[in-house]
Amino acid sequence: MAYKHILVAVDLSPESQVLVRKAVSMAKPDNAKVSLIHVDVNYSDLYTGLIDVNLGDMQQRISEETRSALKALSADSAYDIQETLSGSGDLGQVLVDAIKKYGIDMVVCGHHQDFWSKLMSSARQLINTVHVDMLIVPLRDDE
């Protein structure tokens, strides 16, 4: 099956390059579009008590760093990246919204095979939320 638009969900770790390379290798034969997305935690939802933190400044700084990292990842891909998207909130819902808005027919994401991922797996959440084809790439520290 030829995909038309592949969305790569990245956490901006060094392993994100592995995911982008996989997506590009799938996209090239059919000249499919490739887009990147990073979903950040909405920090204002985490702080419910009295804390003297300027969340607006922190959120702004994180957004700028995210845009910069996505731009670098896009430039390193050696492929024309269609969109570099950044969102915050629930990972599954943000991806579902992007899938609808941009006509995505394949999602590529990674799965860290470590202790914490057994307890809280983003990939498992996506399997139950996303209704397009998915490629889940196992990520190890040695890659």
Curated annotation (Swiss-Prot):
Predominant localisation class: cytoplasm
Localization per record: Cytoplasm
| Keywords assigned | Cytoplasm
The species this protein belongs to is Photorhabdus laumondii subsp. laumondii (strain DSM 15139 / CIP 105565 / TT01)
Gene name linked to the record:
uspA
Q: Which GO terms describe its cellular component?
A: cytoplasm
- Gene3D superfamilies listed in its UniProt record: HUPs
Query: What is the recorded name of this protein?
Result: Universal stress protein A
Q: Which family does it belong to?
A: Belongs to the universal stress protein A family.
Primary role: Required for resistance to DNA-damaging agents.
NCBIfam families per record:
PRK15118.1 (NF011698)
Q: Which CDD domains match?
A: USP-A-like (cd23657)
A Pfam family matched in the record: Usp
Subunit relationships: Homodimer.
InterPro entries, from UniProt? Rossmann-like_a/b/a_fold (IPR014729), Universal_stress_UspA (IPR006015), UspA (IPR006016)
Superkingdom of origin:
Bacteria
